[in-house]
């Protein structure tokens, strides 16, 4: 009987983790981006432009493979939807006020607010494409 309960508990915990991941991938965030269509292949030209923007604007707080002032960017598309990522780039203040994941991240990273870089939608999309390249 104890063995059966242990197995049920293990399965239950596993399902909760999958549910949390699924919830974070379905969350589109708060902002202007409601739908992003990604091609099967990474657009290298866009990714290169996104890399330049990332290096100019984001590396004071974000690293690729490890947490810094903000979270690491590698694997971001496994944790967040494309819309959420772009809304966080374009609309960080409203995101940390209204989006539960952004609020959780703000708390986790010692209430360090992400700066609004006043990027265009296209520039945020280029950064997203760079994230696809490094994934």
Whereabouts are the PLM-identified features?
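Axial heme c-ligation environment in periplasmic c-type cytochrome domains
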Residues: 69-76, 94-123
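Short pre-active-site segment immediately N-terminal to redox-active cysteine/selenocysteine motifs
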Residues: 46, 54-57, 65, 113, ...
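Bacterial signal peptide processing site
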Residues: 15-19
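C-terminal capping alpha-helices of c-type cytochrome domains
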Residues: 83-88, 111-135
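Gly/Gly-Pro-rich "capping" loops immediately C-terminal to redox-active cysteine motifs
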Residues: 47, 51, 63-91
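Sec-dependent N-terminal signal peptides
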Residues: 4-12
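Electrostatic cytochrome c docking/interface patches
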Residues: 20-53
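Short, cysteine/histidine-rich loop/knuckle motifs that typically chelate Zn2+
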Residues: 60
């Amino acid at each position: 009987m104890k063995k059966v309960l242990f197995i049920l508990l293990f399965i239950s915990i596993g399902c909760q983790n999958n549910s949390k991941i699924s919830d974070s991938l379905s969350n589109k965030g708060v902002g202007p981006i409601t739908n992003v269509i990604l091609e099967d292949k990474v657009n290298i030209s866009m990714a290169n432009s996104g890399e330049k923007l990332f290096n100019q604007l984001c590396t004071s707080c974000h690293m690729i493979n490890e947490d810094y002032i903000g979270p690491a960017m590698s694997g971001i598309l496994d944790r967040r939807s494309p819309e959420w990522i772009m809304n966080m780039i374009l609309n960080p203040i409203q995101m940390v006020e209204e989006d539960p994941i952004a609020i959780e991240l703000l708390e986790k990273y010692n209430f360090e607010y992400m700066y609004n870089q006043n990027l265009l939608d296209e520039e945020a999309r280029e950064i997203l494409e760079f994230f696809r390249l490094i994934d």
